[in-house]
């Protein structure tokens, strides 16, 4: 799935929302560590095992080439301010209508409408991929 949009946040900052690509791998991992240390409401803590840079590159490449999954990044001042995505739950008849949604926003950008916009983008992508159920 492909996505690209330039938006203006509530404070007037310009933000580019686009697919994450392989060259974003290090910045994506840095964003993971940052945001997972800013709140207890994400799935893991920053010190729990995550992806290596090659694994993150592969993950972003797979999402970019997928027809039913996506990983988007929000870029502000050349840095990742947020990430969000949808991943299929399964490929069996009983699960292929379901997708998981995940999102993380740098606390510096909370309250500016970025999370709302990225959530709307992921919901639209899920609908386009014919998912009937989106799970947080």
Label for each model-derived stretch:
Residues 1-11:
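Short acidic N-proximal helix/loop "leader" segments that mark the beginning
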Residues 15-28:
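A short beta-loop-alpha structural element at the N-terminal edge
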Residues 25-33, 53, 57:
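An amphipathic alpha-helix signature
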Residues 30-47:
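Helix-loop element at the rim of GNAT/NAT acetyltransferase active sites that forms part
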Residues 49-97, 102-106:
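Acetyl-CoA-dependent GNAT
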Residues 109, 113-121:
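Conserved acetyl-CoA pyrophosphate-binding loop and the N-cap/start of the following alpha-helix
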Residues 119, 126-136:
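Conserved GNAT acetyl-CoA-binding A-motif
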């Amino acid at each position: 799935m492909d996505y690209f949009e330039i938006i203006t946040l509530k404070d007037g900052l310009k933000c580019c929302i686009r697919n994450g690509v392989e060259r974003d791998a290090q910045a994506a991992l840095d964003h993971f560590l940052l945001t997972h240390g800013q709140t207890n409401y994400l799935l893991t803590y920053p010190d729990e095992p995550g992806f290596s840079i090659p694994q993150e590159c592969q993950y972003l490449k797979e999402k970019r080439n997928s027809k039913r999954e996506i990983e988007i990044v929000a870029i502000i001042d050349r840095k990742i301010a947020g990430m969000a995505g949808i991943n299929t739950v399964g490929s069996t008849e009983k699960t292929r209508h379901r997708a998981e949604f995940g999102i993380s926003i740098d606390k510096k950008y909370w309250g500016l409408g970025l999370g709302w916009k990225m959530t709307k983008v992921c919901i639209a992508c899920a609908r386009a991929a014919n998912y009937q159920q989106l799970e947080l």
